[in-house]
Amino acid sequence: MTEIKKLIVLTSGGDAPGMNAAIRAVVRTALHYQFEVYGATAGFAGLVNGQVVPLNSRAVANCIQRGGTILKTGRFENFRFKAVRDKAREFLKKLQIDAMIVLGGNGSFAGASKLYQEGGPQMIGIPCTIDNDIQGTDYCIGFDTACNTALQAIDKIRDTAFSHERNFLIEVMGRSSGFIAVNVGIAGGAEIIALPEFHVDIDTLTQKIKKQHGKKSASIIVAAEANQPGHSFEVAKQIKEKTGIEYRVCVLGHTQRGGTPTVKDRVLASLMGAQAIEALKKGLTEKMIAYQNGKIAVAPLPDPDNGTRYFADEALLRVNNIICAM
């Protein structure tokens, strides 16, 4: 087991509220154990381009309440090429980096894992995505904040929907999973929740709309983006053509990725960040800090080819149908 003296932390992929709380915990826990800590800016691109900054306790002060990431982030597609990873590995070797902590999702973990297998430093992943769709953990940093941001928007839209007696189709993020949609749909009292995991064809959807039409002065559909951002405009168009009922479309978009992290995201991010350092001290590598059954745990990395988690509790949709049908 290699003794860790120098550590690097980076954020990769899409940003998520709570990342800064995790960075802060990583840095200060590492400093507690006398590690020398660095941060790579703009994700894996920072390792290739030599964009690295030393991090001390003051560098992460006053960031726990901030959304986004102080280290910047991004997707770096070229990291899939070995020649590019070799350049990153040589740079880390030159800096004498012993371990790396990656905040991100499946693709980010896979990149760091390959780097380790090719002679790079020990690595631990911390799951950060508002989509909450990483296999092996019940919770990902950023999800709670994103849900609260979306819910605030839905509550405001419902105010105007009621005032004008209008119907709205609200599209939320989530990529190919429906965790955001089902949570904010139930919390926002949506009459219909549309998820990619339980696909409903347009004819079934319009029949449901016609059955509900007239019972209320306004109606809200919450739909997951289902890997097709903006698809709700076409859905609303088909609803109008088949039923004559108009639905105004509101795509919440990237507003869900920003904002001050909630208590839940700050606390879990802090605990996960600290646990990542403890895992490295035990000599662990190619692991993820997960939230399982209400506890912080160390788990295997998700399968890079099959690491997406999907919403599966159809009973929640049935409950919402009963509550919102009246």
From Swiss-Prot:
Keywords, alphabetical: Allosteric enzyme, ATP-binding, Cytoplasm, Glycolysis, Kinase, Magnesium, Metal-binding, Nucleotide-binding, Transferase
GO cellular component: 6-phosphofructokinase complex
Sites where the protein binds substrate: 129-131, 166, 173-175, 225, 248, 254-257
Gene3D superfamilies recorded: 3.40.50.450, Phosphofructokinase domain
Entry's Gene Ontology BP terms: canonical glycolysis; fructose 1,6-bisphosphate metabolic process; fructose 6-phosphate metabolic process
Active site: 131 (proton acceptor)
Cofactor: Mg(2+)
GO molecular function annotations of the record: 6-phosphofructokinase activity; ATP binding; fructose-6-phosphate binding; metal ion binding
The organism's place on the tree of life at top rank: Bacteria
A matching Pfam family: PFK
Recorded metabolic or biological pathway in which this protein acts: Carbohydrate degradation; glycolysis; D-glyceraldehyde 3-phosphate and glycerone phosphate from D-glucose: step 3/4
Predominant location category: cytoplasm
Residues annotated as binding Mg(2+): 106
Binding annotation for ADP: 24-28, 158, 189-191, 215-218
Quaternary context: Homotetramer.
Role noted for this protein: Catalyzes the phosphorylation of D-fructose 6-phosphate to fructose 1,6-bisphosphate by ATP, the first committing step of glycolysis.
Protein name as catalogued: ATP-dependent 6-phosphofructokinase
